[in-house]
Amino acid sequence: MMAYIGFILSIMFVISFVGFSSKPSPIYGGLVLIMSGGFGCGIVMSFGGSFLGLMVFLIYLGGMLVVFGYTTAMATEQYPEVWVSSAAVLGAFVLGVLMEVVLVLYVYKNGEVEVVFNFSGVGDWAVSDNGGFGVFSEEIVGVSALYSYGVWIIIVTGWSLFVGVLVILEITRGA
């Protein structure tokens, strides 16, 4: 049952990003991004990462919802563009969904998809399971590895969020 829930959540996750990338009005784009954040956190929670899923959901909705609200207030339109308002937007959405269906059918037929990258030297990231109960939880080990080995990922993520806010403010300033 959990495999089906994870599969449905991952399909909804990708379809929501296809819906965002088909360039609807900013009001609907922000709504779809919030929904995709919820689906992504549901995927994390379905794999057993309740703490990490909750933290991502709170940070995502707490931080980025302010940006979505501000940009939609600055870029409101009298007649907002929805997915069915023009043939180009609807075609982009349908094409993205069809590409996702083709990928799912390909994976279903072949049983697996090869990984593009070779992951070597990940011994510090791997969590060994001895079959019993231990002192450390797997997600606590992952969070500590993120803050120790992945400090540059945190810095780049924070910087890119800051630059994203500045770009959004600059785009909506002239509107």
From Swiss-Prot:
Signal peptide (from-to): none
Location (main, coarse): mitochondrion
GO molecular function: NADH dehydrogenase (ubiquinone) activity
EC number: 7.1.1.2
Membrane topology: Multi-pass membrane protein
Alphabetical keyword list: Electron transport, Membrane, Mitochondrion, Mitochondrion inner membrane, NAD, Respiratory chain, Translocase, Transmembrane, Transmembrane helix, Transport, Ubiquinone
Annotated GO CC locations: mitochondrial inner membrane
Transmembrane segments annotated in the record for this chain: 1-21, 25-45, 47-67, 87-107, 116-136, 149-169
Gene3D superfamilies, A to Z: NADH-ubiquinone/plastoquinone oxidoreductase chain 6, subunit NuoJ (1.20.120.1200)
Pfam families for the chain: Oxidored_q3
Subcellular localization: Mitochondrion inner membrane
Alphabetical GO biological process terms: mitochondrial electron transport, NADH to ubiquinone; mitochondrial respiratory chain complex I assembly
Catalyses which reaction(s): a ubiquinone + NADH + 5 H(+)(in) = a ubiquinol + NAD(+) + 4 H(+)(out)
Family stated for the protein in its record: Belongs to the complex I subunit 6 family.
Assembly and binders: Core subunit of respiratory chain NADH dehydrogenase (Complex I) which is composed of 45 different subunits.
Function (record text): Core subunit of the mitochondrial membrane respiratory chain NADH dehydrogenase (Complex I) which catalyzes electron transfer from NADH through the respiratory chain, using ubiquinone as an electron acceptor. Essential for the catalytic activity and assembly of complex I.
Name this protein carries in UniProt: NADH-ubiquinone oxidoreductase chain 6
Name of the gene encoding the protein in the UniProt record: MT-ND6
